[in-house]
């Protein structure tokens, strides 16, 4: 009987929220895992919440449902933050100066994907130009 009560004492109830990162605010057409996600986590902590359930984070098919991922291992590229790529030196301020006017009421996944793919190409080109002993290349070599 004592074991049952000690187990209950060790367990604690936690509360949180279910929201996909793509639902976070972003001028890039869809929320991502950049600064806005960090602000959201800070907000959750300030609100006394402990959990953020995100839904699956994999690449999606034509209907863009997080439950229709075509890989259980890959991540959704749209969740890559252009702001963090800028912070890492892989994008320039000028790369982010002409952000399209994405709809605010719903996500235009095709437009967002086309826009972000161009940014990713620029970032990858700059990444390849980094010296082999750069800190970023060293970090990614460990993966």
Segment roles from a protein language model:
Residues 1-2:
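Intrinsic disorder/low-complexity segments
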Residues 5, 10-143:
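Acidic/aromatic-lined carbohydrate-recognition and catalytic surfaces
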């Amino acid at each position: 009987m004592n074991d049952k009560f000690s187990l209950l004492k060790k367990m604690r109830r936690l509360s949180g929220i279910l929201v996909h990162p793509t639902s976070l605010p972003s001028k890039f057409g869809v929320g991502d895992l950049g600064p806005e996600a960090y602000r959201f986590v800070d907000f959750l902590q300030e609100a006394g919440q402990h959990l953020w359930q995100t839904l699956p984070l994999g690449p999606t098919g034509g209907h863009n449902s997080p439950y229709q991922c075509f890989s259980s291992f890959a991540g959704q590229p749209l969740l890559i933050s252009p702001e963090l790529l800028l912070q890492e030196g892989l994008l320039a301020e000028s790369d982010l100066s002409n952000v399209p006017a994405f709809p605010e009421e719903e996500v235009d996944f095709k437009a967002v994907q086309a826009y972000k793919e161009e940014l990713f190409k620029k970032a990858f080109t700059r990444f390849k130009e980094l010296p082999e002993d750069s800190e970023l290349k060293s970090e990614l070599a460990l993966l």
